[in-house]
Regions:
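Sec-dependent bacterial lipoprotein signal peptides
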Residues: 1-12
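Structural motif
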Residues: 6, 139, 166, 230-233
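Short acidic (Asp/Glu) and glycine-rich catalytic loops that position anionic groups and cofactors
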Residues: 10-12, 172, 309-311
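Flexible, low-complexity junctional segments that flank or bridge functional domains
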Residues: 14-208, 214-222, 237, 279, ...
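Short, contiguous clusters of charged residues that form electrostatic/catalytic patches at enzyme active sites
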Residues: 159-162, 326-330
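Conserved acidic, small-residue-rich alpha-beta core segments centered on
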Residues: 187-322, 329
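C-terminal alpha-helix
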Residues: 330-338
Length: 343
């Protein structure tokens, strides 16, 4: 499972004064070796005709003892980018590098200005949740609730969620917009999702790296989503809006919600990010983060490359020009249709 916050919970191998070493070759070898023994997606990420050892041979000729720190950083970054993993990140005092093509190479399917038009000027903010009802039937005053959650790095508590859902008690359903939510704390994903689970639900499995071999993993451990014990349990229809910008803990939230019967994922396949980040420190003090576990859905499928929506919908330019959000409009239709059969 994914969370930037959990990075602080894993064991970091830190450089001591005795270990401190500015040698480009020493740092190149340290980064390559750390990933070699700890990274979890070699089989999924590298082409069939390539190996991690071949990557070492490919980039070693670019290492020289007279190179600058900037040049070394660029070579190490290029080596890491071969893994095409958004969680693989290198941090120095002068730069940070992470792979971002999981999002950048795809349509965004979101227009922020149009999204806030639906929230209107009277929206409220419950800590990290921006919310407002949307009236879609002017004569009958029917409405659905819209929740926008920008980042799971922003804390959300049960009291906040209860306040939002209480305000939507007369709505036919709820839309949760997590488009471009790049993740954050996994605990926030569990907290929010727990208010929509009527019973304990298997939402996936996690396998942890247990040894230096590329295939050494623990047996899959079940991940169970439990209903909240702290307030409102929402049973009406829910639509979660997704795009390629949904990553890491937000990807997990999409995975959790997809397993619930009253929930529909609508939009585009998420960006993925199914590995729990681990961290270490290079001899020169630069920090390295990478995926150290694998997350699977209840059927055993990897979620590293994203979670497909139940209903694929793309944002139309013609709708944007009219001030409309194609995904929100379709989500309203789904909720209206589902609410007809909801007690």
């Amino acid at each position: 499972m994914l969370s930037l916050v959990l990075l602080g919970l894993v064991c970091l191998s830190c450089s001591t004064e005795k270990d401190y070493n500015l040698s480009p070759r020493a740092n190149f070898d340290a980064l390559w070796h750390e990933l070699d023994v700890g990274y979890c997606y070699f089989q999924e990420k590298l082409p069939a005709d390539s190996t991690w050892e071949m990557m070492h041979q490919k980039y070693l000729p670019r290492i020289s003892e007279g190179m600058s720190s900037y040049e070394l950083f660029d070579v190490l970054s290029a080596l890491m980018m071969e893994l095409k993993d958004g969680h693989v990140t290198l941090y120095s005092s002068f730069d940070t590098k992470a792979y971002d093509e999981w999002r950048a190479s795809y349509p965004s399917n979101v227009d922020r200005q149009v999204r806030f038009r639906y929230l209107g000027s009277a929206y409220r903010i419950a800590r990290s949740l921006v919310y407002a009802p949307i009236e879609y039937n002017e004569h009958q005053k029917d409405s659905v609730g819209l929740i926008y959650y920008s980042s799971f790095s922003n804390v959300v508590g049960h009291n906040n969620i209860n306040a939002v859902l209480q305000s939507f008690q007369n709505c036919r359903g709820v839309i949760i917009d997590i488009r471009d939510n790049g993740g954050g704390s996994l605990s926030n994903a569990f907290t929010l999702a727990s208010h929509f689970a009527e019973k304990e639900t298997l939402v996936g499995y996690t396998s942890y790296k247990t040894g230096p071999g590329h295939c050494e993993f623990s047996s899959p451990k079940s991940t169970i989503l439990k209903p909240t014990k702290y307030g409102i349990l929402w049973k009406k229809p829910v639509v979660v809006l997704t795009n390629r910008g949904v990553y890491s803990a937000a990807n997990d939230f999409a995975l959790f919600m997809k397993q619930l019967p009253q929930v529909t994922l609508l939009g585009d396949t998420t960006g993925g990010g199914g590995g729990l980040p681990r961290g270490s420190e290079l001899p020169n003090g630069w920090r390295l983060r990478y995926s150290g576990s694998k997350t699977m859905d209840p059927e055993g499928n990897q979620v590293e490359f994203g979670i497909p929506p139940d209903i694929k919908v793309s944002l139309k330019e013609s709708d944007i020009e009219k001030g409309k959000d194609t995904l929100i409009e379709e989500a309203i239709k789904v909720i209206v249709e589902k609410s007809k059969s909801t007690p």
